[in-house]
């Protein structure tokens, strides 16, 4: 006998998804997405009801998106959410207009940037106010390589990452003995220097006019020009960044970074190579900024100094702080919120940034640890009592 609660639960999630997406997608497209979410939830229910039903559900297109070890690697509680999320991310864009797709592609781009800064600020505790400089390195590096030497986007991705990582190593070596306010001041000076160079080195960067006609990504004869192309591109890069950061966070290097963040002197006394790991943190975080910079240049086919300012660094830092310094899901949520919410408030154009800023201040006042706290769900029941 079918449990009515199990039938209505998927429908409820579908309705919730539809209502939340109406401001972005419109009623008709939101209804389509709600149906896709409800279908994914129903298939998940079927997957837990007998051998025949499991076989039917597993042959569906939805479950094929995350088949294999992805299903067995997650807990029973997270499985349905992962499935619904995968279907929504993969199929949802087909029902969205170009404006919404462009906003979401930008959101995924900022997810990559926020995850990179999280390595430096969240994992290692090194306050970097000049992170947008590495973003600029990747973008300008690829723009110059593309326009002057005809380098393709796919070759430019690792080149941009390496260039930004090299600059990260340089900054890490210079700031080895600095922490806190002093480190913040030096990194602030770094972004200002980079911005001045980009604005005034006309023979290379074309000054404030920027660089035009940057090569777009291309697969065979398919040139990425539509917003949906860049949605899937940035989503793919963001997923790779999430997976790598998750593995790194739980690795020996990740634990050593967090030991440095908590108490650098104690970590060094315990044999942690703090010097090498701090430089590695700068390089790793910068590499993700370089990748994001290449994606940015390929998406817009144009770069200019005004895209890489100190304000950009602050926005990325706000994403990390809002989401939760050590929480990867929190940083992802923080990045998406900070990109998407101002667009939702365009109806009150004159006050949208005021409303958004007030909401951020309120959020950080009532929940200073961020939207998501790492490890909260893993605490044992008796931990609180103890």
Predicted regions and their residues:
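Transmembrane alpha-helices and adjacent helix-loop boundaries
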Residues: 2-386
